[in-house]
Amino acid sequence: MTLQQFADWLAATPPSHFLQDNEAWAIPVIQTVHIVGIGITMGSAFMLTLRVAGVSGMDQTLLDAQRRYLPWLTGALLLLLASGALLVVGEPAREFFSLSFRLKMLLVALCATIAGWFGRSVARRPAHWEERSRRDRKLRVIAATTLLLWIAIIFLGRFIAYDNVWGAWSPAAQQG
């Protein structure tokens, strides 16, 4: 099955028809939920980044900061997964053939992997990471880069609707 065939099949399913038939209210509701998830994700990622960088939150250990914000980050990512999946079901071809969508998914996977790795690493060796967060510039650069990646994800998500800015690079341009 090609990606186009899968998109056509998905667009013909009852959930997709429901979203297409009720797009005047369903899509804005789903997008609002998605935006709330983005806000929670960015807030959590920002606070953790500030703590790792030693800029804020130094009154708590790195492990405490992780315990405080990682559940919010995880929950928000699950919310984004659910709302994002519904947005894909509503317009599968638009999403699947969008360079912005593909790049966004790649960066989401990268950021989720980094967050998971870092979370497990801190939980296993909290003293090591606590000391390292106070003196290691590379760790600060990684934290800041991760935050910039989350911002890029937001940018790419918004640009799904304007994927033609990529011109011939976009798979959508090659489709049509």
Q: Predicted segment positions?
A:
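Polytopic transmembrane helical bundles with strong interfacial aromatic enrichment
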Residues: 1-176
